[in-house]
Amino acid sequence: MGARFSPEIASGCVLALMLLGGVPPTSAHEPVLLDPNRATPGVRLELVEVPLATTGSEAPGYRLAVAGLPTGVVFSVWTKHFGHSFHEELHSGFRVDETGKLVLVQRGGVDGPRYLDQMVFQPEAYPRGANWQVAVASADRTITGFATVIPRPIVARDGPCAVSLELVSHRGLRFLASGSGFAAGEDVVVESRYSGRVSRKQQRVSAAGLLPKEVVSHAAVSDDRDARFSVKGRSCEVTLDYEWGNAALRGH
């Protein structure tokens, strides 16, 4: 599962990262070159979504906005795909110019300079609900910055209410549920269904209208990998249909 890179396209939740925990089985033998928990203070990265001619099964494209990097240092751009460590260097040779932008000077200078904020990065086939990370790092990796997005979110809305699930298991067994837009302090009914099992409980919404975050876990009891998560309040009812297990890991 790589990333596209061309003149136009280069193919990324603290609690979620804690739930993933350490080095996943799929990357057990990959060196840990960059650690998001050790980002350089003052360095800021943001992935800004841009419209692309994609289908619903494809991830969107992003431009990378960077601030706080020093001059006189060479930087590289890295990506981290779900289930792996940072090991894919997309491009190197960026420097901060007099305007504060990262610029890549082509060999020979035939095509002129290329600015990082004009490039578009796009992960290839990617699981729903999984996060994608991009990093900018100095050549010696002492200066680093990170940005995280969920290219294909699992989210549903009803009026002002929204509920989302983030994939936090490399086996597709756990999802982090969160919600917003509910009536402050109201009691809502949270229901999880999969493989004939039903779990139902009451949760209290915060004063800010947020649903308490919780981990939704799954265990194999049949071949059915379809699941449903719903939250019902006084004025809205939000339902999410999704897949879990190996079916959740497919980038389709």
Regions found by a protein language model. Give the residues of each.
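Ubiquitous "structural anchor" signal
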Residues: 5, 19-21, 187-189
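Bacterial N-terminal signal peptides
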Residues: 11-21
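Extracytoplasmic/secretory-pathway segments with low complexity and glycosylation-like composition
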Residues: 27-252
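Bacterial N-terminal signal peptides that target proteins for export
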Residues: 2-13
